[in-house]
Amino acid sequence: MVVKFTKSEALHKEALEHIVGGVNSPSRSFKAVGGGAPIAMERGKGAYFWDVDGNKYIDYLAAYGPIITGHAHPHITKAITTAAENGVLYGTPTALEVKFAKMLKEAMPALDKVRFVNSGTEAVMTTIRVARAYTGRTKIMKFAGCYHGHSDLVLVAAGSGPSTLGTPDSAGVPQSIAQEVITVPFNNVETLKEALDKWGHEVAAILVEPIVGNFGIVEPKPGFLEKVNELVHEAGALVIYDEVITAFRFMYGGAQDLLGVTPDLTALGKVIGGGLPIGAYGGKKEIMEQVAPLGPAYQAGTMAGNPASMASGIACLEVLQQEGLYEKLDELGAMLEKGILEQAAKHNIDITLNRLKGALTVYFTTNTIEDYDAAQDTDGEMFGNFFKLMLQEGVNLAPSKYEAWFLTTEHTKEDIEYTIEAVGRAFAALADNK
């Protein structure tokens, strides 16, 4: 099968004349998979995409995670339509934002108080500000390879040592800002302890993806998150969970419910918007009371809590409350994992597959992936070839070796069976070109 992308290629050529790099987020380009024009989608329904050339795909991108209920879910679409008919932006309080805040609190008991913002980046950025206001300290800690949005303070790399002050990961981020960030490897208690022994008295908070989603799906080792809480609290700092990817993705109550570990502050996004722009943050009452108008930590937003996003988020959570959906995602995920591993063995392709319920990552390596260094040391060229072969098979993945495959509640066993067959054909082609 040879799929043509003529219209996507023409559209990308035109986009390059008007939009920086031809895309509105760099992760949408095909730079990480060998280049070429990214595929422009025209519509989505359920588990499927159709591009501007009319090609149909089974979608495992899910907009990098938010689309857990599938594209154009009727309950969510109706809620958005009703909100639009009533006016999408007021600049005033609404009943919808109160209802949605109550739903989030009921789902995640660690949220005594909630504030809505417009993106995951904004949610994380503000939790850092609140933690600094509460503790009176300035430094933060993060784990290498964990992405927490594109604000200056979190765009840092690990530096040259195992536990270092940060170095900028983007042009335009001053070294002085990066020096406020301490980066340590994920799943390594000893290095975390060493860093806290050295800098703990200056640390306001540690940012934690409780289940990593940004160098693939990587779970914490048993007891790791509990030890993080213990060591960080001993240092007088706060624990911030970045659940922008994980909240409502693996379990209704988020990773903190699934893993049984409670943070001081939580940042949310992606799934909670039902596909519309959103972010939220919340936590313990005494910490959240640092936020204006109650406290000195200022945060505001013209679009924050807009009725359309609130309505979409409420509708999404109502869908996810239906019995058996998370069990279905886990069942389909297990089926997909088993099939991919069988195809890899059949065609002698070396892979490591990390899966948690309805999300997984295929790494082209034989190594165990438990931290960022291991994820980096995988075959990006082979992934790029695999990605393009899967496009030809009508299977849409994220164009990066670090990203996850996300299942939706609309995927079927037939979709999984076809995907496994497509993986087999792609692996056969890779084996022929070794």
From Swiss-Prot:
Gene3D superfamilies membership: Aspartate Aminotransferase, domain 1 (3.90.1150.10), Type I PLP-dependent aspartate aminotransferase-like (Major domain) (3.40.640.10)
NCBIfam families to which the protein is assigned, alphabetical: hemL (TIGR00713), PRK00062.1 (NF000818), PRK12389.1 (NF009055)
E.C. number(s) listed in UniProt: 5.4.3.8
Chain positions with N6-(pyridoxal phosphate)lysine modification: 270
Cofactor: pyridoxal 5'-phosphate
Catalytic reaction list: (S)-4-amino-5-oxopentanoate = 5-aminolevulinate
The protein's assembly and partners: Homodimer.
InterPro entries per UniProt: 4pyrrol_synth_GluAld_NH2Trfase, Aminotrans_3, Aminotrans_3_PPA_site, PyrdxlP-dep_Trfase, PyrdxlP-dep_Trfase_major, PyrdxlP-dep_Trfase_small
Subcellular location: Cytoplasm
GO BP term, example: protoporphyrinogen IX biosynthetic process
GO-annotated cellular components: cytoplasm
Main location: cytoplasm
Protein name, as recorded: Glutamate-1-semialdehyde 2,1-aminomutase 1
Organism (species): Bacillus cereus (strain AH820)
Keyword list, A-Z: Cytoplasm, Isomerase, Porphyrin biosynthesis, Pyridoxal phosphate
Homology family: Belongs to the class-III pyridoxal-phosphate-dependent aminotransferase family. HemL subfamily.
Pathway: Porphyrin-containing compound metabolism; protoporphyrin-IX biosynthesis; 5-aminolevulinate from L-glutamyl-tRNA(Glu): step 2/2
Pfam families: Aminotran_3
Gene Ontology terms for molecular function: glutamate-1-semialdehyde 2,1-aminomutase activity; pyridoxal phosphate binding; transaminase activity
Cytoplasm is among the record's keywords: yes
